[in-house]
């Protein structure tokens, strides 16, 4: 009997020790997680980080490998580009098969494909490669822009980004935190500027202002977005933009629309698709 009780006591003490070790490990893990929190530049940086906790991070996109979706770009005159977009997130590989191209290289008649393989940009019409420098310049801009607009919210934590918190403002009865974004560029090259309007209730960017310095667009353009949840990632599947001022007032009620649908992640895309 004595030995039985002794064994029970030993088992009880062992279980307490195990629980204590488990608790210690839990505390240690929590502490490690706290240490791994980003070091924020300022409040603006922290707000952008909180936004990515809602939308998903770029690592979440990398985990999903790749994507295929149907994309429409429509200008106020109702002319459209309609394409099947395919991306591999690791390396930002990009490919577009155009069902219609009334805005992008409309002078090139026939079935158009564009691609970026991680090194080179290319374009083909009816299977024939086009090497004209102006066409390649157009494709370079389109491939980069299409990929960036799709993944922008996740990429706002990329390196070489500067954040500035500008305070709060009310737009159409909604309170927003405003964060200015600029980018570190090579040499003395001018940076695009983004001004995010972050909803403090949802932590999402409802709209933003942007410039496109490479196209000499230095006056702000206002972009408004609507999100869709696809496999746990919040994506801005409807976007529209128009001319604005730096107070986000619409200067011209004529909008360019961008519509993303039929989104499919993890399609096991072959990298050969992205080569010319």
What are these regions (language model features)?
Residues 54, 162-167, 221-224:
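Short structured motifs
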Residues 175-274:
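Gly/Pro-enriched, hydrophobic low-complexity segments
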Residues 32-33, 38-40, 45-129:
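N-terminal mature ectodomain segment of secretory-pathway/periplasmic proteins
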Residues 25-28:
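N- or domain-start disorder-to-order transition segments that initiate the globular core
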Residues 20-22:
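Bacterial signal peptide processing site
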Residues 15-18:
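C-terminal motif of bacterial Sec signal peptides marking the signal peptidase cleavage site
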Residues 1-7:
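Bacterial N-terminal signal peptides that target proteins for export
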Residues 40-42, 118, 122-190, 212-215, ...:
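Flexible, processing/modification-adjacent segments and terminal tails
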């Amino acid at each position: 009997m004595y030995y039985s009780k002794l064994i029970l006591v030993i088992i009880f003490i062992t279980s307490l020790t195990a629980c204590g070790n488990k608790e210690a490990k839990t505390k240690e893990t929590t502490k490690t997680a706290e240490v791994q929190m980003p070091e924020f530049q300022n409040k603006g940086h922290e707000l952008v980080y909180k936004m990515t906790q809602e939308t998903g991070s770029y690592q979440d996109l990398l985990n999903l490998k790749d994507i295929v979706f149907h994309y429409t770009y429509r200008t106020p005159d109702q002319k459209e580009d309609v394409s099947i977009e395919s991306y591999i997130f690791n390396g930002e590989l990009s490919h577009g098969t155009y069902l219609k191209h009334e805005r992008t290289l409309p002078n090139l008649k026939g079935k158009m494909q564009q691609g970026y393989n991680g090194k080179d940009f290319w374009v083909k019409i009816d299977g024939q490669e086009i090497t004209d420098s102006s066409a390649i310049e157009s494709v370079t801009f389109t491939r980069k822009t299409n990929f960036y607009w799709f993944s922008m919210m996740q990429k706002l934590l990329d390196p070489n980004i500067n954040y500035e918190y500008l305070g709060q403002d009310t737009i159409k009865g909604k309170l927003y935190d405003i964060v200015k974004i600029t980018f570190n560029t090579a040499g003395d090259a001018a940076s695009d500027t983004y001004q995010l309007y972050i909803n403090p209730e949802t932590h999402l960017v409802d709209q933003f202002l942007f410039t496109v310095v490479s196209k000499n667009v230095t006056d702000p353009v206002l972009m408004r977005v609507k999100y869709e949840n696809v496999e746990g990632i919040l994506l801005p599947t409807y976007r529209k933009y128009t001319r604005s001022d730096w107070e986000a007032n619409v200067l011209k009620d004529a909008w360019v629309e961008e519509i993303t649908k039929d989104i499919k992640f993890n399609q096991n895309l072959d990298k050969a698709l992205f080569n010319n």
